[in-house]
Regions:
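Divalent metal-cofactor coordination and adjacent catalytic microenvironments
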Residues: 1-102
Length: 102
């Protein structure tokens, strides 16, 4: 997901999660960049393009990735969220396996 193509509803949801109640271009640009970085990171962990608009592991992880990135704490994100990252990978593997057998 490119920073210029962040769905407006995703940007609004992330800002809400971060308790950002104001609107300004600089904040939106920063959060959009963090969302783009987070989706690239999580897509690489998930093995493909993930759905961040639907509730589930990818969306949950993205929200917290952006929170950690905004707070300059990405060095501990993967360690703190390893169990959720693995759960996301397992869920995707099961879903992909089910599609192959159908």
């Amino acid at each position: 997901m490119d920073r210029k193509n962040i769905p407006p509803e995703l940007l609004a949801d992330v800002k809400n999660y971060l308790n950002i109640t104001w609107n300004d271009d600089a904040t939106d640009a920063k959060i959009s960049g963090l969302i783009a970085s987070g989706t690239a990171y999580l897509d690489s962990k998930g093995g493909g393009v993930l759905d961040y608009l639907a509730d589930g592991f990818p969306r949950t992880l993205l929200m917290d990735f952006v929170r950690y990135a905004r707070d300059e704490a990405l060095d501990v994100f993967e360690n703190n969220y390893l169990s959720l990252i693995l759960a996301m990978q397992n869920e995707r593997a099961v879903t992909d396996g089910m599609e192959i057998t159908e």
